[in-house]
A protein has these predicted regions:
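Bacterial signal peptide processing site
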Residues: 22-25
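Extracellular beta-sheet/turn segments enriched in Thr/Pro/Gly and aliphatic residues
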Residues: 115-135
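Short, ordered, surface-exposed loop/turn motifs in non-cytosolic proteins
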Residues: 41-65
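Short, acidic Ser/Thr/Gly-rich low-complexity loop/linker segments typical of extracellular
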Residues: 60-87
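A short, solvent-exposed beta-strand micro-motif common in secreted/extracellular proteins
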Residues: 88-111
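A short, amphipathic beta-strand motif
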Residues: 31-39
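Exposed beta-strand and adjacent loop surfaces of beta-rich binding modules
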Residues: 32, 47-49, 100-102
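Sec-dependent bacterial lipoprotein signal peptides
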Residues: 1-20
């Protein structure tokens, strides 16, 4: 009986330690967004800076590029890819691991400064894509 009790205790402690130290699946997944920039003909637009603002920053400051939470320049395929949006305090238990990011593309067309924006609500671990037509 004593041996059985000792074996059960060791097995139980091993199980508790294993499950307590394992990572959640969502912790392994980075939260990311790809903004696809295209012109009126659907051709990719490269070299455009896109700014990302978390909900608190957007609500407080708006589209002030100096205060952007993240920024990326679109690549040859017109993609501005934001990875690891969950670094920092953007996703917490306070906001139920959810945050709305506003993405703002600043560009010039026909010698005029323009801005196009899109807001995307994300849960921690999401991977979303949105297209912006720059016209």
């Amino acid at each position: 009986m004593k041996k059985f009790l000792m074996y059960t205790t060791v097995l139980l402690l091993t199980a508790i330690t294993t499950f307590a130290c394992s990572k959640d699946k969502d912790e392994d997944k980075a939260t990311s967004v790809t903004i696809q920039l295209v012109d009126l003909l659907g051709k990719p637009v490269k070299g455009v800076r896109v700014y990302a603002y978390d909900q608190d920053t957007w609500n407080t400051i708006g589209d002030e590029t100096f205060h952007a939470t993240f920024q990326v320049v679109s690549d040859d395929a017109g993609n501005a890819t934001f990875t690891n949006l969950d670094k920092g305090t953007q996703f917490t238990s306070v906001n139920n691991e959810t945050n709305t990011f506003t993405f703002s593309a600043h560009y010039t067309l026909n010698n005029s400064s323009k801005t196009k924006r899109v807001s995307i609500t994300l849960k921690k671990g999401d991977n979303k894509t949105e297209k912006l037509v720059l016209n």
